[in-house]
Amino acid sequence: MMEPRYQEIPSSESPTVEQDGVWVRVIAGECMGITSSIDTKIPITLIHVKMKPESRLVQQLQADLNGMIYVFGGGINLENETRVKKSPIAFGIGAKQGIQDGELALLSEGEEIVIKSQEGAEFLIFAGPELNEPIERYGPFVMNTKEEIHQAFSDYQNGTFVN
C-alpha cells in the first residue's frame, strides 16, 4: 500500500495557458506546453479546459492510461479515430463523436485526442493507470479491503494517518 500523503496546492499555483480560443488549467500532467506543479507518484492527467466556439485542442495521453472526458458546459466533438470504450450516454463509436453537457466519455487506448467545439465548451480530461485491484470505499477513504478501511479510520482518529 502506498503511504498516504497530502499536497496543498492553491488553484493560483496551478498553471494556466490560453491560445487560439482554448484556455486550460493543468492540475496534473501536461497540456499545451505547460506542466502541473504537483508531485504525483503515478502518472495521472487532470486538465480543466474551456473552449470558445470553433476552437480545437490536440491533447497527448499516454497510451497505457485510461482516459475520460466529462463535459459540464456546451459540447465537443472527438475529431480523430478516438473511440469510446463504454459510456452511459447514447452516441456511436467512431469519428466525430459528440459529447454534450453532463456526459462522460471513456476513451479507448490511444496517444492523441483531437477535440473541437462548435459552440464553446467546458470540460475535464482525466487519465490514469488501471488499478487492477479490488476497491473498498467508505466515507473519505478508498482502500482494497474492509480491514484497510478500519485501519485508516483508526489511524485518522489516533492522529497517525499522515506523517
Q: Would you name each region that the model predicts?
A:
Residues M1-N163:
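Jelly-roll (double-stranded beta-helix
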